[in-house]
Amino acid sequence: GPFLMLGIFAIAIAAILFFIKLPDPDKDKAADDVEAAADLKQYKSSVFQYPHVWFGALAIAMYMGLEIGIPSMLPAYWKADPSLPGSATEYLPFYWGGMMVGRFVGSAILAKFKARTLLSCCLILGAACVGISFFLPGMYAVYAMLAAGLFHSVMWPLIFNLGLQELGPLTKNASGLINMGVLGGATLPLVMGTVVDNPSLGVGVAIMMMFVYYAYVFWFCNFGSKI
């Protein structure tokens, strides 16, 4: 089904990220980082000793649950209300389009706001869209769900930046570790698809799962990234 295809796609992306060889950073910049580290602080010997990197990887996994969760749930709205026009697949491009627009707009405002402030606002507004969709009738519910894409669009770089704070020469290794969080995109849609298709659970439980993802990323943004 569509959930299996989403999971396979996410696994493929994760495999590419795992095996791809990232280019080395500029040598002069690396030397400057090491010199600055000697002057300012003593970095730990391994990236694995920084808890906020692990928390960041899990935040990326949770974000993947949010990003792919909406396309996973949208067909259930048509199943619950056959009177809705068209089909879920006809409206999914609006979700991805909203994410694309959000990324263009977000790139212009990322430099003007603190990462924690912007990410917190996007999480709250995205959660509001998803929550409201559960109570709205007909296409209004669909539009509210699709609107969440605008706020999801800038979360990835913000989570990534918070997970790479104050790592100096260990930044490259940490980025690889955080990228492994994309594996969450391979598992969470499958779980959510199972929940949505279960008559005793359904969309309501899937939305509660998304609120767990929102809550964790919010915690990471304001607390976990500082550890």
Which ranges hold each PLM region?
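C-terminal membrane-cytosol helix-exit motif in multi-pass small-molecule transporters
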Residues: L4-D33, V217-S225
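Juxtamembrane intracellular "pre-TM" segments in multi-pass secondary transporters
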Residues: D28-G56
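Extracytoplasmic gate region of multi-pass secondary transporters
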Residues: S45-P93
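Interfacial helix-cap and linker-helix signal at transmembrane-aqueous boundaries
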Residues: W78-K79, I109-L110, M192-L201, A206
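Loop-to-transmembrane helix entry
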Residues: D81-G98, N173-L177, V205-M208
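Helix-to-loop junctions at the C-terminal end of transmembrane segments
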Residues: G102-A115, V196
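Structural signature of the two symmetry-related core transmembrane helices
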Residues: T117-I132
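Intracellular juxtamembrane helix-capping segments at the cytosolic ends
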Residues: S153-G168
